[in-house]
Design a protein with these regions (language model features):
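Long, intrinsically disordered low-complexity tandem-repeat segments
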Residues: 453-492
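Long, charged/polar, low-complexity intrinsically disordered N-terminal extensions
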Residues: 1-122, 142-176, 180-181, 185-188, ...
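Secondary-structure-rich domain cores
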Residues: 384-458, 490-503
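C-terminal effector modules of nucleic-acid-centric enzymes and ribosome-associated factors
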Residues: 426, 432-435, 441, 451-454, ...
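Accessory interdomain/linker segments of ATP-dependent helicases and helicase-like nucleic-acid enzymes
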Residues: 7-10, 280-423
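Metal-dependent DNA phosphodiester-chemistry modules and their immediately adjacent helices/loops
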Residues: 116-124, 128-251
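Long, charge-rich alpha-helical interaction segments
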Residues: 189-295, 299-322
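Structural motif
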Residues: 37-42, 67, 127-130, 419, ...
Length: 574
């Protein structure tokens, strides 16, 4: 937790209301997202109980499993879920735009430009909490290997074609959600807690009702009191007034209402199977009762989810959010192409190379996300400045200098007065954004005494004898004009310290820097110690070239998905 986040949480406790951590929204929100609010059955690992799903906040589709221990009813639920979600996922697949990218020519091995399709937009799924994201992954894992009648006419329990297809898409979305900054599958609690700091712990922020109570409390009610009500207030029957956001249910609801209703449903179903008169009507009433009970637990969470979306939409979108969303569109397009090409579903386990590629991609994405958020948001940048990872200040002197190469290049020395305390060392690389959006690089030279840098003796301290030009000395010696080298004592700990930065890039190819590429005296500048567009590491080998230290090349004769599972028994179909 950063210092500025800690301060914001303390401020939230004092004010009784969540405090903003950002000035802009750092995640993309689709114009028509699909909300998915699931519930699972207590005591049945991964067994769905019901769900609200849809793109219309006023008309969600309610799906239930009246008896989660019944395999046929669970499969019917998955089929209904596929009928509801898969058309939404497919609706973005055909509207495309052409993009030019470079690909390796298989004949020449050279990079050549090619025209490829990129979906103009991508579907977005919203779930209430991080537990909902985990349940989406679980659904994908349980659905994508189901066999259809077309694939295996002899399979005892064939699934509709959309069920394994939806499983593949949910698996892809679940994997994509692990990439920092991805917005294909979003947890609303994670999204809200990124943009607001509450007076409670991160674990307590996973309760959607409690989190919203801090961000938007009722009039005249402190956030802590409103959050406590949302977490634990019960009615006269002992039931939570604000049901949990799922997928787990409230034990009191399970014991007092759900279990008796399921017993009545089971009894009516048994009577109906025996042909008892009036049993069909009782079965319909029992199912309607279950639908009402499950809806009573889902609808408050559904409304809270859309309330959170409204709060997030009140923030303007960050400048670099569209760039990250484009990567999500590429990801969606690539998976669409794999599905259309008839490729098999994702394996249960990644091979060594694929796993390493995923980890490297996520590390790069995290570094890019951190940089983008700081560059888009002065409040986030303030946190980086407090952490010593950036500094901002006023340019108090500019001295033109050139490199000593055969073709001299401009290497101006910029003296910046700042109140920040960055973690600088000799020749540390620095980065800033120019007015046209390009990145400019520099390096830290040393500290300059503020009285000399300000030219109190009638001259520009940085250009006086032994000034900033002597500060360029990397041996840490002190120039006679009062500017210390990077290794010297300098004025690092005094108020209003002055730092000398040498520009090393972003000034064009000529001997003279391009207009606007060198800051002028009096300009406000912000330098960062982190790269603005970090890149990944070296390319990894093909799976066929996997070294023996990581298992060697995959064996074509070995099972594709690890060891064979135990044979199926009757207990597997309970």
């Amino acid at each position: 937790m950063s210092l500025i986040t800690t301060l914001a949480r303390m401020e939230a406790v004092r004010e009784g209301r969540a405090q903003p951590l950002t000035t802009v929204r750092h995640r993309h929100l689709s114009e028509r997202p699909l909300a998915f609010v699931p519930l699972t059955t207590a005591g049945e690992a991964g067994a769905p109980l019901g769900a609200l799903v849809g793109t219309d906040r006023d008309a969600p589709r309610l799906l239930i499993v009246a008896q989660p221990r019944d395999r046929d009813l669970r499969f019917a639920f998955l089929a209904e879920l596929a009928e509801e979600i898969q058309p939404y996922l497919d609706s973005y697949a055909d509207e495309v735009e052409l993009e030019e990218r470079k690909e390796t020519d298989p004949e020449t091995g050279k990079k050549v430009p090619v025209q490829v399709e990129l979906c103009a937009d991508a579907p977005q799924l919203l779930v209430p909490s991080a537990a909902g994201v985990a349940f989406v992954r679980l659904l994908g894992r349980s659905m994508r290997f189901r066999r259809t009648a077309e694939q295996d006419p002899e399979t005892p329990f064939p699934a509709p074609a959309r069920v394994p297809l939806l499983g593949r898409w949910l698996t892809h979305y679940g994997e994509r959600s692990r990439v920092p900054g991805s917005c294909l599958l979003l947890s609303l609690t994670e999204l809200l807690s990124r943009h607001w700091a509450t007076g409670q712990s991160h674990l307590e922020d996973q309760h959607l009702g409690s989190l919203l109570a801090w961000i938007d409390p009722p009039e005249g009610v402190p956030g802590a009191e409103a959050a406590l009500r949302a977490e634990s207030e019960r009615d006269e029957h002992g039931l939570l007034r604000c049901p949990p956001a799922g997928p787990a249910t409230d034990p009191a609801f399970d014991n007092q209402l759900l279990a008796p209703a399921m017993s009545r449903y089971d009894a009516a179903r048994a009577e109906a199977s025996q042909g008892v008169a009036g049993a069909e009507a009782r079965l319909r009433l029992a199912e309607a009762e279950l639908r009402g009970l499950i809806a009573s637990q889902l609808r408050p969470t559904w409304d809270a989810l859309w309330h959170g979306v409204d709060l997030l939409r009140s923030l303007p979108e960050g400048a670099r959010v569209a760039e990250r969303w484009k990567r999500d569109r590429w990801s969606y397009t690539a998976h669409r192409d794999r599905v259309r090409a008839g490729e098999p579903p994702q394996p249960k386990r990644d091979d060594a190379v694929t796993a390493a590629q995923k980890l490297a991609a996520r590390e790069t994405a995290q570094a890019q996300l951190d940089a983008h958020e700081a560059l888009d948001d002065p409040l986030v940048m303030a946190g980086r400045r407090l952490a010593g990872e950036a500094f901002a200040g006023e340019v108090i002197d500019v001295e033109m200098a050139w490199s000593e190469a055969r073709v001299p290049r401009p290497r101006p020395l910029i003296t910046v007065r700042t109140e920040d305390r960055p973690h600088l060392a000799e020749r540390v690389k620095l980065h800033r954004v120019l007015a046209d959006g390009r990145a400019q690089s520099g390096e830290f030279v040393g500290f300059a005494r503020t009285d000399v840098a300000a030219g109190t003796d009638g001259t520009d301290g940085a250009t006086g004898t032994g000034g900033a030009d002597r500060a360029a000395g990397t041996d840490g010696t002190t120039g006679t004009g009062g500017a210390d080298g990077a290794g010297g004592a300098g004025d690092a700990d005094g108020p209003g310290r002055a730092l000398v930065v040498r520009l090393t890039g972003g000034m064009g190819r000529g001997k003279q820097p391009e207009p606007g590429s060198v800051p002028e005296k009096g300009d406000r500048v912000c330098w960062t110690l982190f790269e603005h567009a970090p890149r990944g590491g070296p390319e990894l080998p093909d799976p066929e070239s996997t070294p023996w230290t990581h298992g060697g090349p995959p064996d074509a004769a070995a099972p594709a998905h690890g060891p064979e599972p135990d044979p199926m028994t009757e207990e597997d179909y309970l």
